[in-house]
Amino acid sequence: MPASENRPSLAVALATTADSVAAWLDGAIACSGAPGARLSAAMRHATLAGGKRLRPFLVIESAALFGVPSHAAMPAAAALECIHCYSLVHDDLPAMDNDDMRRGRPTVHRAYDEATAILAGDGLLTLAFEILADDATDADPAVRLALVASLARAAGVAGMIGGQMLDLAAEGRFAEGAAHGVPLDLPADSIIELQAMKTGALLRHACEAGALLGRASPPERASLDRYARAVGRAFQIADDLLDVEGEAGLVGKAVGKDAAAGKATLVGKLGIEGARAELARLVSEAEAALADFGSAATLLVEAAYFIADRRN
């Protein structure tokens, strides 16, 4: 889709957001004296290694729909990125996905050690809520409270963490006897629910955070939520397709691991062509959800197409 004449292209907007978030986190994660220096270094390794910064971008662009400048949305955006990065640190651990590479370089537990990686993830998790509680995030304590509650729900048992637990259960991790390690044959509806929790919840929070900062009306918040739900599902399908078709050097992490682990994915259930058709439908659904915002939502609409077409 063409960018609005008065707004930057999506590539420029994503790059600007990525640079701004990195600079903000660089200042927020201070290097302290030993033993804090090792912990801070591990937290910085997790957060300053690049990445698309898609979640902060969604916070900033959702807030922009209501006239909130990017610098005012940055604390909420950075807090969400802390949660995302913490989840990656813990997901990469041997007890979870056992990955050696992330964003083209060693994962935190490989660069440091498992104990430091666990604590670095914990540090990022708690830093996120420290950021949201600060009055620099928003002058209105009610808005800060709403942001904290929204992120806690999205990252917690009803969201990301619960989705990860369902994912592990689907791999047969908790079964006993001969069933241990045997993947479950989940129906498509169960896979969608799992992915909505594991991946979609944080993306929904991103748009909700922007709406909260912008004092959006209930109908406006509902429109953004419909967009985020569709984008969340599209993101996971695209991610699963990358695991099947991607190249490790481009993706920045190992590929082919989902099938090897017997992970439940819509690509496995629908096949590649069926998954691509569902991906196209979800992008159209995301675009339709933002129709009432007109050209102000151009970058958010472009982001949906970008998510579907990404190569890393």
What are these regions (language model features)?
Residues 20, 29, 33-288, 295-308:
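Mg2+-dependent prenyl diphosphate-binding active-site environment of isoprenoid biosynthetic enzymes
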Residues 1-30:
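N-terminal amphipathic/basic leader segments beginning at the initiator methionine
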